[in-house]
C-alpha cells in the first residue's frame, strides 16, 4: 500500500510538471500535441488506403480493419501517455548514456520512478484521444454488441498489448548494460518493429508466419490478434476455444514482463559492479 501511495504521489507531481510546461510554453506544447496527432494519422494511413482500394484485405473488411487501426492507436495512446516522457520507454538510452544513476539516486523505489517519470497526461494525450475516437467510430460501423464485459475485455487487451510492447522494448534494452554505446538506440528498433507491422492484418498469412508474429516477434499481438478476438466476442462467438484464445494475450504479456524483470535485474547487478564506461573526469554524457 505504501508503494502504491508513492506511485500515485509521483503521478501527481509529473502531472503538475506537464501542466506547468503547457502553461509556461504553450506554443511548443501545442506543437508537440499536433505533431503526435499527425503521426497517428500517418501511421494508419497506409493500411487504411489499402483497405479502401481493395475493400479490405488479410481476412478483414474495411470496417474491421478500421477497428483494428483504432485499437492500435489506442494502444499507442496509452504508451504515449504513460511512457513517452524522459525517455522512459526508450530505456536503452538511459542505460547506454550512463543516466540510470539519475533514477537510482531518487528517494523512491527504482520501479516506481521508472513507471512514473514518463507520465504526460496533457502533452502525451493526443494519440489516446485519437484512438478512442477512431475505435468508437469503427464500432459504430460494425454489428457489435457493446456491453460492459466487452468494454472490460477491450481495456484488458489494450493494457496487455501496451505491457507487451514495453516489456519487449525493455528486454531488448537490457543489452545496453553490456554494450552501452552499441545498444543505446536498440529500444527504438523494437518500437519501429511494432509501428511498421502491427497494423497489418495477418488472417491470410501462412500458419508459420502467424506463429512467428504471435510468439518470437509478437507484433501480431499488439493489434491484429486482440482485434480479431474482440470482433468475435462482440458478435457473440465466445465458446471454450475462444476462451482459451482470449487468455493468450494477457498471459503472454505477463510472462514476458516476468522475463524482462528477471533479465533487467541481472543487468542491474552487472551495472552495480561495472558501472557505466561513459563516465569520465569531466562527468558523464
Q: What is the predicted role of each segment?
A:
Residues 2-285:
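Hydrophobic transmembrane alpha-helices and immediately adjacent juxtamembrane helices
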Amino acid at each position: 500500500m505504501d508503494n502504491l501511495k508513492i506511485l500515485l504521489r509521483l503521478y501527481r507531481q509529473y502531472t503538475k510538471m506537464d501542466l506547468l510546461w503547457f502553461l509556461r510554453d504553450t506554443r511548443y506544447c501545442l506543437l508537440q500535441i499536433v505533431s503526435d496527432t499527425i503521426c497517428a494519422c500517418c501511421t494508419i494511413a497506409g493500411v487504411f488506403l489499402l483497405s479502401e482500394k481493395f475493400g479490405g484485405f488479410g481476412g478483414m473488411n474495411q470496417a474491421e480493419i478500421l477497428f483494428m487501426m483504432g485499437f492500435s492507436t489506442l494502444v499507442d495512446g496509452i504508451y504515449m501517455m504513460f511512457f513517452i516522457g524522459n525517455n522512459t520507454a526508450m530505456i536503452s538510452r538511459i542505460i547506454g548514456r550512463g543516466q540510470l544513476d539519475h533514477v537510482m539516486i531518487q528517494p523512491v523505489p527504482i520501479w516506481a520512478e521508472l513507471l512514473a517519470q514518463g507520465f504526460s497526461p496533457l502533452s502525451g494525450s493526443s494519440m489516446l484521444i485519437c484512438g478512442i475516437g477512431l475505435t468508437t467510430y469503427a464500432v459504430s460501423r460494425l454489428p457489435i454488441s457493446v456491453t460492459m464485459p466487452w468494454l472490460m475485455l477491450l481495456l484488458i487487451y489494450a493494457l496487455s498489448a501496451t505491457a507487451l510492447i514495453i516489456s519487449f522494448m525493455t528486454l531488448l534494452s537490457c543489452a545496453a548494460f553490456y554494450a552501452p554505446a552499441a545498444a543505446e538506440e536498440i529500444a527504438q528498433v523494437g518500437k519501429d518493429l511494432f509501428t511498421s507491422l502491427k497494423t497489418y492484418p495477418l488472417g491470410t498469412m501462412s500458419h508459420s508466419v502467424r506463429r512467428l508474429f504471435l510468439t518470437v516477434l509478437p507484433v501480431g499481438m499488439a493489434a491484429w490478434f486482440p482485434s480479431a478476438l474482440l470482433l468475435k466476442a462482440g458478435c457473440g462467438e465466445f465458446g471454450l476455444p475462444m476462451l482459451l484464445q482470449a487468455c493468450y494475450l494477457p498471459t503472454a504479456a505477463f510472462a514476458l514482463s516476468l522475463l524482462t524483470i528477471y533479465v533487467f535485474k541481472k543487468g542491474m547487478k552487472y551495472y552495480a559492479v561495472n558501472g557505466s564506461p561513459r563516465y569520465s573526469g569531466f562527468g558523464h554524457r
